[in-house]
Amino acid sequence: MSAQKSGLHPRNRHQHRYDLAALCQTTPELTSFLIRTPAGEQSVDFANPQAVKALNKALLAHFYAVTHWDIPPGFLCPPVPGRADYIHHLADLLGETTGSIPAQATILDVGVGANCIYPLIGVHEYGWRFTGSEVSDAAMSSAQAIIQANTGLSRAIRLRRQKDPAAIFTGIIHKNEFYDATLCNPPFHDSAAAARAGSERKRRNLGQNKDDALNFGGQQQELWCEGGEVAFIKKMIAESQSFRRQVLWFTTLVSRGENLPPLYRALTEAGAVKVVKKEMAQGQKQSRFIAWTFMDDDQRRRFITRKR
């Protein structure tokens, strides 16, 4: 009998423990990374970065029809179930205006990353179309390689280079473009030292040797920015005002609950009409995203009607 993972969205495909036999059949290379736990159960060697990457490759192939997926060394290797949760909760948010989840939604992924994870899940689950922005040439090349290697994705996902590292929406959202939502997994540390300390804690918890590459890796732009998560999201809030009539919902993950009060104050000052917090949980890990709009109920309905 499979044990259920607590807290995942009801539509999340990862409600139960991984069916390792099925995943290994999909991605045979995963077989070499299986271990026995002290309790005698078969598991993946999560302390091995290559094992985590092989697991992601298997999950994306088995559940989301992504037959070719890879990322360069040192980039974030995201936990798929948690990323899927963001997509499903975002779908619920978009469905609240009309009573049904939109089948033709257009989404902007701020910082799509080398892994391209949110568009891959969103296209398969809901048929959405994505624009992914990225400041890193290496990350953008990796994401583009994934898109080109999988049939049909180039029609659903486009990438745009953010030429100004200090900008978020400016230069990415073009005139006369409209998005149902933006999403973002922001950098959460405020310095390289803090990012290294966080990575070291993760390494110790996983029992890795110092020479091991980190499971979830991460480049500078993925892990930290000046002022940390709060400063980054405040910048996003300020910039969102300029695109208040082009985007229905702006959203972003917030890693720590204590970061919410200053963000709520910034949203009030920016004139957000409605602010929503969506709580998520993956096992013992708690997470959340906030969403804000500058449109009232009638304006949101008209936006959707015109866009469709």
From Swiss-Prot:
Gene3D superfamilies (alphabetical): Vaccinia Virus protein VP39
Protein family according to the UniProt entry: Belongs to the methyltransferase superfamily. METTL16/RlmF family.
Protein name: Ribosomal RNA large subunit methyltransferase F
NCBIfam families xref list: PRK11727.1
Keywords: Cytoplasm, Methyltransferase, rRNA processing, S-adenosyl-L-methionine, Transferase
Nucleotidyltransferase recorded as keyword: no
GO BP term, pick one: rRNA base methylation
Swiss-Prot/TrEMBL catalytic activity: adenosine(1618) in 23S rRNA + S-adenosyl-L-methionine = N(6)-methyladenosine(1618) in 23S rRNA + S-adenosyl-L-homocysteine + H(+)
Enzyme class (EC, first level): transferase
One matching Pfam family: Methyltransf_10
